[in-house]
Amino acid sequence: MTEDGIKWACEYCTFENWPSAIKCTMCRAPRPSGAIITEEPFKNRTPDVGSMEREIGSPLICPDSSARPRVKSSYSMETSSKWSCQICTYLNWPRAIRCTQCLSQRRTRSPTESPQSSGSGLRSIPGPIDPCEEYNDRNKLNIKGQHWTCSACTYENCAKAKKCVVCDHPTPNNMDAIELANTDEASSIINEQDRARWRGGCSSSNSQRRSPPTSKRDSDMDFQRIELAGAVGSKEEFELDLKKLKQIKNRMRKTDWLFLNACVGVVEGDLSAVEAYKTSGGDIARQLSADEVRLLNRPSAFDVGYTLVHLSIRFQRQDMLAILLTEVAQHAAKCIPAMVCPELTEQIRREIAASVHQRKGDFACYFLTDLVTFTLPADIEDLPPTVQEKLFDEVLDRDVQKELEEESPIINWSLELGTRLDSRLYALWNRTAGDCLLDSVLQATWGIYDKDSVLRKALHDSLRDCSHWFYSRWKEWESWYSQSFGLHFSLREEQWQEDWAFILSLASQPGASLEQTHIFVLAHILRRPIIVYGVKYYKSFRGETLGYTRFQGVYLPLLWEQSFCWKSPIALGYTRGHFSALVAMENDGFDNRGAGANLNTDDDVTVTFLPLVDSERKLLHVHFLSAQELGNEDQQEKLLREWMDCCVTEGGVLVAMQKSSRRRNHPLVTQMVEKWLDGYRQIRPCTALSDGEEDEDDEDE
């Protein structure tokens, strides 16, 4: 007893050292020079007021005689028989079978278990106690504020410690947002338990007449302690819960954290978190597991089996639904030529990178040296119907095809073009991230994705090196477009510069969505026109119109000389924030199709007629025209005829001719398509024959 009374406690690890030790035996910290208030004087003995003052020294918070009324201790005999709760240390009456504060079950004391010394010694003090001693728990709270409790092992560390000295767990301030949500809850339980112990260490009179909380924060913390203590049930269960959460976090990978952040982003309306998960290649149809729901710790928002789509519907995130629903629909098995032949695809990418050059002169824009147009092979029609259906399911985007054909007559609305002139357009499937525009442009030309961002780099470099040229066109076009809708306003030059800087930044960020200006620049890089067939309005998940899309129209390389460009355009489709390549199927190339069209081509050339009017026979808009080039429809039609090979069909439809040749096509692209098609040709023997005559025909062949 005497030796324990003269030991000194380390201010870092609270270990009790012998008085002759100048350093802590456990953590090697130097012995403090001043007095430190600890709980040790209250343990294992019955102190008097004089000894407490000698050992503790001056308290950190000591109210004067006017702060608290001087009262004598009462009910000492009754309080001495109270039992202390094992969870919150609250002193309950002997007849209580549950804790009044946290409702935890009273634990039966074993014969070998000794009573708690932290409270019994103080409860046996018979005489009156000074108010400074009575409210000394405030001093202890001050000391506790200088420490932080480890959420993994519940060890109390010094405030200066960056990590737990026992388990090396980092401080809560260094953890991620999702980890903080869990550790805050754990630390709140521990802090409330500590505060309850400090209250139990006070005098019997203070225990008997506890004053109500002095602030709203204290009452909120008490209410939270009651709820959490009732949920945990016991300290052992709480420690097991912390251990389980730590195991779950250790198993988490980067993709898992991105998925959880995306779920939180849907709930909080943060689209960037969802886009970050999409860009990383995450599965949009992924469901929340029980461990992930436990880690998120928000039962009101998350449930097992929920996907990002479920959360978007529940919290009415219409903008996210428009993107996510397209994503989920595309998780069917896809098999495009670029996926079947990775070696050839890499060679094609190297060919594209080698064909990118920069024009010398004032307009130093980048351009491609090769003219390549991708078309579906005509050999597809030789496959059995079941194999054809499988092929189209794996190479086409059925949702985009349906939206452009059935929901709105945007493509293939002319029976003359689709049937008699063999100019039916097919929407190819591609990635649905922010690179879909660049992917669709390369698919319409070379049949592959812009996986290495070769086209994006050329786009950004062209915008940077030719910024003055494109900026003047963009500014003039935006001003005219706003005035055409009756929006008469003027912007300061600083505002125009800020908007232009944002357009430049989008071009340099892989995965960032692109705008009309980028399509205009891509037309200059390809040196050929780009025709976009797209929906006219943005719509919500419920079908409500939100605004104009402004993407549909013709984009001409107006800043090049006409002699430097090709007149064969490519076609793209736009639906709900997504671009798709629109390609045709090879045809025989004969027959003078189209009134007034003198093709004069051999049988190897495929001619696709792309309409320059919509289903209402209105001329498509030509984007980024200057004030001198703007005019009525006749003047714009004349401009289109100058930049493209145009003709009028017998049905009176103004069309542009897209010409492609298998012999003139790049050999690597032809080889890639043939290898892809061979995979479907091998499926043919597995199909059932309809009758015996077909079997005989196959044998004759």
From Swiss-Prot:
One of its GO terms (cellular component) is cytoplasm. One of its GO terms (molecular function) is cysteine-type deubiquitinase activity. The active site is at C436, H578. It comes from the Eukaryota. It is an enzyme of class 3 (hydrolase). Keywords: ANK repeat, Cytoplasm, Hydrolase, Metal-binding, Nucleus, Protease, Repeat, Thiol protease, Ubl conjugation pathway, Wnt signaling pathway, Zinc, Zinc-finger. ANK repeats lie at residues 253-283, 306-333. Residues 108-129, 197-220 are annotated as: Disordered. It catalyses: Thiol-dependent hydrolysis of ester, thioester, amide, peptide and isopeptide bonds formed by the C-terminal Gly of ubiquitin (a 76-residue protein attached to proteins as an intracellular targeting signal). Residues 425-585 form the OTU domain. A zinc finger (RanBP2-type) spans 3-33, 79-108, 143-173. Pfam families: AnkUBD, OTU, Zn_ribbon_RanBP. Zn(2+) 3 binds at C150, C153, C164, C167. Its EC number is 3.4.19.12. The keyword Ligase does not apply. Its main location: cytoplasm. Residues 108-121, 202-214 have a biased composition (Polar residues). The keyword Zinc-finger applies. Belongs to the peptidase C64 family. Ubiquitin thioesterase, which specifically hydrolyzes 'Lys-29'-linked and 'Lys-33'-linked diubiquitin. Also cleaves 'Lys-63'-linked chains, but with 40-fold less efficiency compared to 'Lys-29'-linked ones. Positive regulator of the Wnt signaling pathway that deubiquitinates apc protein, a negative regulator of Wnt-mediated transcription. Acts as a regulator of autophagy by mediating deubiquitination of pik3c3/vps34, thereby promoting autophagosome maturation. Plays a role in the regulation of cell morphology and cytoskeletal organization. The RanBP2-type zinc fingers, also called NZFs, mediate the interaction with ubiquitin and determine linkage specificity. RanBP2-type zinc fingers 1 and 2 (also named NZF1 and NZF2) specifically recognize and bind 'Lys-29'- and 'Lys-33'-linked ubiquitin. RanBP2-type zinc finger 3 (also named NZF3) binds 'Lys-33'-linked ubiquitin and shows weak binding to 'Lys-6'-, 'Lys-48'- and 'Lys-63'-linked ubiquitin chains but it does not interact with 'Lys-29'-linked chains. PANTHER family: UBIQUITIN THIOESTERASE (PTHR13367), UBIQUITIN THIOESTERASE ZRANB1 (PTHR13367:SF28). This is Ubiquitin thioesterase zranb1-B. It comes from Xenopus laevis. The lineage of its organism: Eukaryota, Metazoa, Chordata, Craniata, Vertebrata.
